Design a protein with these regions (language model features):
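Short alpha-helices
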Residues: 101, 288, 296, 305-310
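Nucleotidyltransferase catalytic core that binds NTPs
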Residues: 1-193, 199-202, 211-220, 231-232, ...
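Acidic/Gly/His-enriched mid-domain segments of enzyme catalytic cores or analogous surface patches
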Residues: 212-213, 218-279
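A generic local secondary-structure boundary/capping motif
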Residues: 196-197, 217-218, 294-297, 304-305
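Long, charge-patterned amphipathic alpha-helical coiled-coil/hairpin "stalk" segments used as oligomerization
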Residues: 264, 284-301
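Glycine-enriched alpha-helix->loop->beta-strand junction motifs that scaffold or abut catalytic
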Residues: 91, 222-224, 301
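Structural motif
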Residues: 204-207, 225-228, 252-253, 279-283, ...
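Short helix-capping/linker segments at secondary-structure and domain boundaries
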Residues: 149, 300-303
């Protein structure tokens, strides 16, 4: 088969990753030019509200194409339906796909033949596997499992080791990691109400860390999807911790994690709790102060994590790829416990 003149590609291309790179590169190896038809925001965000905007997705592909030296051979277009120009294009002679989208390409070719047009050469491209051997996909990235390079943010053998925080991180981790919403310490619902007003309906989970935060949310009848408590506040026993109505949580888990340590027990318990569809309470024997670090690394993108900042209010941080990158940077400094 000779080289193709113009290859068509269609899709969402959310969180442009190594699988997308492989798909585009393969089509470019067999074609002079490639038209990428990006699904518009209305359709894409109906599929998943966490899909990035068309403009951002367009810019990410453009930046990759420029860096790879393909700018002159790739053009980007808005796709408003499932098939775009493929059934009627007289310029295109090829179409790229993966195994899942192969049936759509076959339907397109059938429509072309009925219209008296030549069928498109189908370039079927294999998926790329991540570090765990599973397919790299935008959905797994949005689920918070892997980064765009196909590597787990936290997984494998690291899930089964204890890690101690070095003293050099003390000052950094004392600072609010997120947006601080201030309010009187005597009435934490004031600060919490400000934080809740910011969280969008599309957030997959509301996650609370700390007895005061969890107690406040329950009192406000805003039951978190996942909550961590250790019976203390300001590193002292908190008598009111016993008053928490645990019956609002469908599932209860208990783990151990001493102060300054992230244990395998905490990691595995957090991962399991995040998979629960019902409200889950995690009781930490020890200290839950470092739980947000693990939560952000394991949680789906878009999750809202709240914790208390003593004497100041409530800190809210949304789990994003940037959040995961920073938490990964911090955990890389932790030392392994023997």
């Amino acid at each position: 088969m000779g080289r193709n003149s113009l290859c068509l590609l269609g899709g969402t291309f959310d969180r442009f990753h190594i699988g997308h790179e492989h798909l585009l590169t393969t089509c470019l190896e067999q074609s002079d030019e490639v038209q990428v038809w990006l699904i518009g925001d209305e359709i894409a965000q109906r599929k998943n509200p966490l899909v990035l905007s068309w403009e951002v997705r367009n810019d990410e592909i453009s930046a990759w194409a420029e860096g790879a030296g393909f700018s002159e051979r790739i053009s980007l277009h808005l796709l408003k339906d499932k098939v775009g120009p493929a059934p009627t294009s007289k310029e295109a002679d090829a179409i790229g796909c993966t195994l899942e989208t192969l049936p759509t390409c076959e339907v397109i070719n059938s429509r072309r033949q009925h219209a008296g047009l030549s069928p498109l050469n189908i370039i079927q491209v294999d998926h790329v596997s991540g570090s765990d051997g599973e397919i790299v996909s935008s959905s797994r990235i949005r689920a918070g499992e892997i980064g765009r390079d196909g590597c787990h943010w936290l997984g494998g053998a690291e899930m089964h080791i204890d890690q101690r925080m070095p003293a050099m991180l003390n000052d950094e981790l004392k600072q609010p990691y997120g947006t601080l919403y201030e309010g009187p310490e005597s009435n934490p619902s004031v600060a919490m109400s400000k934080a809740l007003a910011i969280i969008g309906d599309e957030s997959p989970k509301l996650i609370a860390v700390g007895d005061v935060c969890v107690h406040t949310l329950v009192d406000m009848n805003e039951i978190p999807d996942l909550a961590f408590v250790d019976g203390m506040t300001k590193r002292e026993d908190w008598p009111s911790a016993a008053d928490l109505d645990r019956t609002v949580f469908t599932s209860l888990s208990i783990c151990t994690s001493p102060p300054g340590v992230i244990t395998a027990d905490l990691k595995l318990t957090t991962k399991l709790a995040l998979s629960n569809s019902e409200p889950t309470l995690v009781v930490v024997n020890g200290e839950e102060d470092l739980a947000p670090l693990i939560v952000h690394l394991l949680a789906p993108l878009g999750c809202a994590v709240v914790y208390g900042q003593p004497g100041k209010g409530v800190v809210l941080r949304i789990t994003t790829e940037e959040t995961k990158e920073n938490c990964r940077r911090l955990l890389d400094v932790f030392t392994r416990e023997v």
